[in-house]
Amino acid sequence: MEQQKTILIIDDDLALQTVLEIALREAGYEVILANDGQEGIEKLTTTSPDLVISDIMMPQMDGVETFQQIKEQLQDNGIPIFIMTALNRKPWFADLEAEGAVIIQKPFDIDQLLRLVNDMLM
């Protein structure tokens, strides 16, 4: 039997965090929650997620800095990182994508996100 995949969600929006948690758990994933970038980085020291979903606009440490630190900490071991944003497409999104991030535009369809997660982890 295949081991359950783990997803780390980093987001300061508790409502969105809850929606994502419920949808991902119902899809069969284990979910770990962090309320900001710093907490997300700390969770990486005690867990080994198969995928990270992070918001871009957060207090203290934004999603871009969080992404950079995750990449540094995981030493580019291939864990997919999704970055959610309500911002219109910015030129620097291409830099994040070149480094391996998947940009998810808000609002998004939860079923589409689940398909993307499933495709990435299968």
Where are each of the predicted segments found?
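Acidic catalytic/metal-coordinating carboxylates
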Residues: 36-39, 62-68
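Active-site residues of response regulator receiver
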Residues: 55
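Receiver (REC) domain active-site loop signature in two-component systems and cognate sites
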Residues: 58
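Non-catalytic signal-transmission and effector/linker regions of two-component phosphorelay proteins
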Residues: 1-6, 111-122
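Acidic, metal-coordinating helix/loop segments flanking the phosphotransfer/catalytic sites
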Residues: 33-51
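Charged docking surfaces used in two-component/phosphorelay signaling
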Residues: 18-26
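Alpha4 helix (beta4-alpha4-beta5 surface) of REC/receiver domains from two-component response regulators
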Residues: 65, 79, 87-105, 111, ...
